[in-house]
Amino acid sequence: MASRTDLFQSPDYYMVDELLSEEHQLIRESVRAYVKKEISPIIEDYAQRAEFPQQIVAQLGELGCFGPTVPIEYGGGGLDYISYGLMMQELERGDSGVRSTASVQGSLVMFPIYAYGNEAQRKKYLPKLGSGEWLGCF
């Protein structure tokens, strides 16, 4: 399997960095480092084979990319929408399909269960979706 080096640089042309809290910067840097280490080196090879790298699902769950705005007690990250946007931006930088996986899991699968499901449904589904043990669909 051929790997590639992630040479992406992210100049702050609009001076957004100075507007971010330390927590937001840490979240962004954590996801950016993950993408550089785990996604960028493998994703082109998977794309050429028309395969999805299944091993990243649990990693994305562990990193908190599934349901980051869902409360912690239900298996989410309990974060704000700025954090969510930064996480998705960094995943997108690595691969659009990876970002789609995370955003569908969090926004189109987990959030509706949290917002409209009953307590039993929240407790049954959200922790396993948040960890990546289960992968939802839309």
Spans of model-derived segments:
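Intrinsic disorder at enzyme termini
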Residues: M1-E23
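Glycine-rich flavin
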Residues: L26, A33, E38-F138
